[in-house]
Amino acid sequence: MDAQERSERPDPATDPGRGRRLGIDVGSVRIGVASSDPDGILATPVETVPRAKKVPRGTVSPDIARIAEIVREYEAVEVIVGLPRTLRGEKGSAATAAIAFAERLRREIPDVAIRLSDERLTTVSAARALRDSGVRARGQRQVIDQAAAVSILQGWLDERSAVMRSVGEAESATSSGDDA
């Protein structure tokens, strides 16, 4: 499997450090966007971008252009694109579309890291959370993609925090062992 098709996990070796991260939920009709705070602790919804239909080859689609604009507005250091896999972990048509979207976005913003992150059932869990909070089905359509993007990004932020904390603890243990 190509590296661009695998979901990634936070890695201290490639981590861009402090700064905002964006989470992207690529749907067939809409794209949900979420952002973190600069310390990478909390994900919040940003907006829902309409998915572009057919775009002439060689041109930047309006959805990619808008996401790139949001990346610049938020001065994002990293973009996490949800990679929807089947429950068996296989790549379906939605995953293929998310990978293609990530590649097109990568061409527009080459200086910003684009990561793919497993997002199985994020839309389902987002819909359940919205329903449980009293949002009616009709109102969900406007925010479901943002809620899924928040879920994707928050999962990444939580995992990143754990990875960075464990690296810090390992370095601390190593340096305190040097004193003995």
Curated annotation (Swiss-Prot):
Superkingdom to which the source organism belongs: Bacteria
A Pfam family assignment: RuvX
InterPro entries: RNaseH-like_sf, YqgF, YqgF/RNaseH-like_dom, YqgF/RNaseH-like_dom_sf
Enzyme Commission designation: 3.1.-.-
Amino-acid biosynthesis in keyword set: no
Biased composition (Basic and acidic residues): 1-12
GO molecular function: nuclease activity
Span list, region Disordered: 1-23
Gene3D superfamilies assigned to the protein according to its UniProt record, in alphabetical order: YqgF/RNase H-like domain (3.30.420.140)
Major enzyme class: hydrolase
Keywords: Cytoplasm, Hydrolase, Nuclease, Ribosome biogenesis
One GO term of the biological process aspect: rRNA 5'-end processing
GO (cellular component) term, any one: cytosol
Compartments, as annotated in UniProt: Cytoplasm
NCBIfam families: RNAse_H_YqgF
Function: Could be a nuclease involved in processing of the 5'-end of pre-16S rRNA.
Similarity comment: Belongs to the YqgF nuclease family.
Name of the molecule in the record: Putative pre-16S rRNA nuclease
Species assigned in the record: Nocardia farcinica (strain IFM 10152)
High-level lineage: Bacteria, Bacillati, Actinomycetota, Actinomycetes, Mycobacteriales
